[in-house]
Amino acid sequence: MEAARRPRLGLSRRRPRPAGGPSGGRPWFLLGGDERERLWAELLRTVSPELILDHEVPSLPAFPGQEPRCGPEPTEVFTVGPKTFSWTPFPPDLWGPGRSYRLLHGAGGHLESPARSLPQRPAPDPCRAPRVEQQPSVEGAAALRSCPMCQKEFAPRLTQLDVDSHLAQCLAESTEDVTW
C-alpha cells in the first residue's frame, strides 16, 4: 500500500543550456581577440587565485589549427627484397619537454613570460622531417648476457627491444615459475 502512495520517479532528458553570456556559446578559440584574452586572464586567475594580473598577461598558447602548416611530408622509399615501399614519416614532436610553457614561477605564483622561461635555442622547423636514430645496443653491467630461461647467449649488437622480446617469448612458452 505504501508503494502506491509514492510518486513514480522517472528519467527526463536534460535540456540544453541557453546560449547566453558574452561568448554566445561559441568555443574560446573562435572568439574575438579581446574576449579571448579576457577568458585567458580569467583562466589564469582561476588556476592561481593569488595571481595579480595588473601588467601584461602572458600570450595565449597557439591553438593547433593556428600553427604554421607546411606542405605534405616527403615520402621515403625503401626496398625489402623484390618489393619497394613508400612511407610518409611522422612530423617531429613540437611540444616535447623542452617546449612546454611555464607560466607560473615557484610557489609565489608570479607570472613569467613564456619567452623568458624557455631556453634560448632555435625553434624546430615544423616542416623538417625527423631524423631516424639508431637504438643503442645493450651494454653495461645491468645488461643480460644470456637468457635466464633457455641460456641462449645474446649477441652484443642486439637492442634492448630484441632482448625484451626474447625474454617475453621464453616466458610465454615456459611452464615453470621463474624468480628474477
UniProtKB/Swiss-Prot annotation:
Component of the Fanconi anemia (FA) complex. Interacts with FANCA; interaction is direct. Interacts with REV1. Reported to bind monoubiquitinated REV1; however it binds better to non-ubiquitinated REV1. It is found in: Nucleus; Chromosome. One of its GO terms (cellular component) is cell junction. Component of the Fanconi anemia (FA) complex required to recruit the FA complex to DNA interstrand cross-links (ICLs) and promote ICLs repair. Following DNA damage recognizes and binds 'Lys-63'-linked ubiquitin generated by RNF8 at ICLs and recruits other components of the FA complex. Promotes translesion synthesis via interaction with REV1. This is Fanconi anemia core complex-associated protein 20. InterPro entries: FA_core_complex_assoc, FANCA_interact, UBZ2_FAAP20. Residues 1-17 have a biased composition (Basic residues). Changing D164A: Abolishes binding to ubiquitin. Its main location: nucleus. Residues 1-28, 106-135 are annotated as: Disordered. One of its GO terms (molecular function) is ubiquitin-modified protein reader activity. It comes from the Eukaryota. Disulfide bonds: none annotated. Keywords: Chromosome, DNA damage, DNA repair, Metal-binding, Nucleus, Phosphoprotein, Zinc, Zinc-finger. The modification Phosphoserine is found at S113, S137. Zn(2+) binds at C147, C150, H166, C170. A zinc finger (UBZ2-type) spans 144-180. GO terms for biological process: DNA damage response; interstrand cross-link repair; translesion synthesis. The UBZ2-type zinc finger binds both 'Lys-48'- and 'Lys-63'-linked polyubiquitin with preference for 'Lys-63'-linked polyubiquitin. The lineage of its organism: Eukaryota, Metazoa, Chordata, Craniata, Vertebrata.
